[in-house]
């Protein structure tokens, strides 16, 4: 999951070096390779090695909390994490397993760096296919430099490319995913939302459909956080969350409108030079619109400011669509089920059995993809 809208201060992750002496039983590299369907390529080998490193750092949260050397900030975060984790299973119907009941201090701000790419004249993301996850709209690396190396290669092939750090990910229940130190860079409510999101992936994951999977998990994240705040009687935080959701909807509306303009442009028979110029105009206009929205809302979106500074492109809009395009459809489905989560999950499972095109016709704007 990528936290799309806000970025915490750099180097704000609390450290818990004292707990590193505790270890849970290690999966072997062979087990990680089996999960990935083999480690016959350097890419899969780095993925397996990175996963083993994360799992090697796991410490039971109860152990961390009992350790008198645990920094106060880590202790406070993990106390709240433990409560949110119980709420996730007891009240949201999310998997009751060992995931997010341990902590891993990974010593860096992100656990992986995702590469998203789209053709020069398309907002459909390039897809990469893997044995377990199926085909997804990104390629992740446990170290930053290889992600940028791939980005340079793709750019040389004519793709628009984006590289983003990711604070959390899910192994879809294959391993007991820990709470990562990279996740503690965010506020406690964002941390709870991240756990709800990642557990939703464990509850339901459809091969070869990133948009469906991410929108489902984002919907569970939103609903779960609202119910978690209501459970705590956190009226002020609830209002802040709703205000943030409204700001997010306005921002996503700008991004999806720009995406629609580009889709129309790319479908036109314009000469290449003219299309390049008009593409640049769309992104210039979007930059102006984002900054006007920031002024009107009285907020700043650091992540999007970074995007503007680096140059907006098709890959940026493709990544936003992956997380948000189908969310309104999932929210409608939830309301149709009387806002009852078990009924909602059952309805989503039925949709998951349909062909991808039919799922998207019911929930999302159908879209094509570039394959490679």
Walk through the language-model features, giving the residues of each.
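Bacterial N-terminal signal peptides
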Residues: 27-38
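Bacterial signal peptide processing site
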Residues: 40-43
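Amphipathic alpha-helical packing elements
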Residues: 48-88
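Acidic/histidine-rich, surface-exposed loop or edge segments in extracytoplasmic proteins
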Residues: 55-70, 128-136, 310-311, 328
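Acidic/His-rich structured neighborhood in mature extracellular/periplasmic domains
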Residues: 84-248
């Amino acid at each position: 999951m990528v936290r799309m809208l806000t970025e915490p201060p750099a180097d704000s992750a609390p450290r818990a070096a004292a707990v590193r002496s505790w270890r849970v039983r290690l999966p072997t590299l062979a087990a990680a390779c089996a999960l990935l369907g083999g480690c016959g390529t350097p890419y899969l080998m780095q993925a397996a090695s990175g996963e083993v490193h994360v799992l090697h750092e796991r410490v039971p949260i109860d152990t961390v909390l009992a350790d008198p050397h645990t920094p106060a900030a880590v202790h406070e975060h993990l106390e709240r994490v433990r409560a949110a984790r119980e709420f996730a299973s007891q009240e949201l119907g999310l998997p009751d397993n060992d995931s997010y009941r341990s902590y891993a201090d990974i010593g860096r701000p992100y656990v992986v760096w995702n590469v998203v790419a789209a053709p020069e004249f398309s907002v459909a993301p390039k897809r990469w296919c893997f044995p377990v996850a199926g085909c997804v709209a990104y390629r992740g690396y446990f170290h930053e430099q290889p992600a940028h190396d791939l980005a340079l290669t793709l750019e040389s092939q004519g793709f628009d490319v984006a590289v983003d750090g990711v604070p959390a990910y899910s192994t879809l229940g294959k391993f007991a995913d820990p709470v990562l130190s990279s996740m503690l860079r965010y506020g406690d409510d964002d941390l709870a939302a991240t756990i709800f999101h990642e557990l939703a992936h464990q509850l339901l994951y459809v091969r070869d459909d990133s948009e469906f999977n991410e929108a489902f998990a984002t919907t569970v994240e939103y609903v779960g956080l609202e119910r978690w705040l209501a459970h705590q009687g956190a009226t002020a935080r609830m209002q802040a969350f709703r205000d943030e959701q409204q700001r997010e909807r306005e921002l996503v509306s700008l991004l999806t409108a720009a995406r629609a303009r580009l889709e129309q442009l790319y479908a036109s028979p314009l000469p290449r030079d003219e299309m390049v110029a008009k593409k640049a105009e769309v992104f210039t206009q979007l930059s102006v619109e984002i900054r006007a929205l920031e002024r009107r809302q009285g907020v700043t979106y650091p992540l999007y400011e970074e995007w503007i500074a680096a140059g907006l492109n098709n890959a940026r809009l493709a990544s936003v669509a992956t997380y948000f395009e189908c969310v309104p459809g999932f929210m409608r489905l939830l309301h149709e089920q009387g806002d009852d989560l078990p009924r909602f999950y059952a309805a989503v499972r039925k949709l998951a059995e349909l062909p991808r095109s039919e799922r998207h016709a019911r929930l999302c704007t159908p879209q094509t993809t570039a394959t490679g």
